[in-house]
Amino acid sequence: MLAFRAIAPDGSPVDGFSFDGNTVTYERDEHVEAGIRAELELPETDDPRWLVPGVFYGENRVESCTRLYPRFTPGRADVERMESDAWSFRADRCSTPAVFSGGRGLVTSEVSPLGQAGVGFALRNGRPVVWLDFPYREEPLRYDGSETPAPRDVQTYRWQPGESVELDVREGDLSSLRRAAPFVDPGWVPVEEAAALAAFGLHRWHYRADPPRLLETVGFDREGDRDAMHVSWVSGVPYAYALLRHGSRVGNREYAAAAEAVLDHVASSLAPSGTFWAQWTATRGWTTGWHPDHSRLHARTLADATLFLHRSGPRWEEAVRSNLDVACRTQREDGALPSAHHVETGDAVSWEGTAGIAWIPALVEAGRLEEARRAGEYYGRFDIFSGAPEDVDLAPTSEDGYAAVMAFVALEDWEAARRAADWMLTFRYTYDVEFSPQTLLGRYEFKTRGADQASPANQHLHAFGLICLPEMVRLARVTGEQWYEQTTRENLACFRQFVARHDGDFGARRGMTTERYYQTDVFEAKGGVLPLSHAWTGGVLLYGCEAALELGL
């Protein structure tokens, strides 16, 4: 049953309020500082299956995960390790301001008459309890993106005698994550122009010829470039492929030649394992990437490079085959593929998480269907995916969702693909965050609907969802589920904002795009962007635009 109460900053009850539906009235003669909590108790369970969209997934962090960020631990709390049996968060962290247990819960809007709203949950005597706070409370700590817990952030409202407000409190299920409101395309430029700008930026600012590479990051102010290239993920093959595809379509031989040179560089530099290396750096040459264990190569990094190199053409077939041979040789009897491979032998060094799912599309497209299907049967058992990016260890991320969608669509396993897409879309913003007009995002009236939260560990918006644009469109058209195509249109529209149209546009150079849009109080102040251009952000926008043009999206 839904119940309302007024609470003081310390959580104790405050008297003098009446509640009629969602209307709250303060009836005392003196002002008071208090918040309002709407709380829903759910049936007893031993697995509450928490979901705060974009923020919290089940226990949220497995015990073996090396990256610290909020984790659910029944019956105990350790704030220094960001572990607790009760959590509260501000609404703008959430891709939809909502909280669920077992698919049931409460939904609200980001902003209320009392200030920004909040969500929270706890397990009390075996019963999940979910709530909405007006205004928000962040407890038992405030997560600022670092591994050091910040003090809790508790907001209250100053009530005047006789004041009455109407709050947005709705009971709901996971269908609440499908936004039905009309959508107005906020893109600054049409798809064709966005492709041209992204291609220009990728070639002009990120490409270097000796050796051929796409720099992972370059500064808006032309300071602090990172002279390194992953073979995929944050640089490398997928984005060289996009540049090659664009250059071929528009007849720009300079773009195509640069892309081919990057692909040649990657394909001709295999590790002793027979796979690609993970990363090239100016100081160390070819090396293993960002994981602290320098004997391991991350499977998703290798697999995406293999997939997009295969798509680039038969010229690089030998390198593709070498990588797939390693993946197949190391596949377990139950179908699992390694999450990481040893740099010398190619043998599995980790099975944790689901990063190995990224091999499936490459296996399918190369005709290795038996191995791909066995892997699909294994990964089809999962309802939470984790471990795709190199930088957050075993955290669940939106990138895991993209990898799962790409895998199951490649297999034409439409039921698994729908489940993967629905999970992935829990990271997608269904509303436009309110920004102060005194911030960069506020001045440019940035619309967040269609953007994805990177992960519970990295709470910023990013454009990586464009990597699975073709698969989402195919899924929509095969199943008749037009919501998948609509949200994919929104995803592409969102990131046709903030592609620099000219030098000086939002402080960037023409064609630059950023990795991070700060929609909440994490890493940097809300309303800013990271003033770096990334090869992957321009590359994935270019890829998404080229695919959209081909598909008539």
Task: Show the residue positions of the predicted features.
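Structural helix-adjacent loops and short alpha-helical linkers that scaffold large soluble proteins
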Residues: W188-V189, H246-E260, L309-L324, C328, ...
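Active-site neighborhood of glycoside hydrolase catalytic domains
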Residues: W359-L363, R374-F385, D400-E434, F464-L492
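Active-site lining segments of carbohydrate-active enzymes
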Residues: G285-H294, L307-E365, D422-R428
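Low-complexity, Ser/Thr/Pro/Gly-enriched N-terminal "stalk/linker" regions
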Residues: P9, G126-V129, E163, D173-V231, ...
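Well-ordered alpha-helical segments within folded domains of soluble proteins
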Residues: A228-S248, D293-R311, G346-E365, D393-A410, ...
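Glycine- and aromatic-rich loop/turn segments at beta-sheet edges
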Residues: A196-A228, S268-D293, C328-A348, Y379-T397, ...
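Polysaccharide-binding surfaces and accessory modules of carbohydrate-active proteins
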Residues: L2-N125
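Beta-strand-rich recognition/accessory modules
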Residues: W87-W188
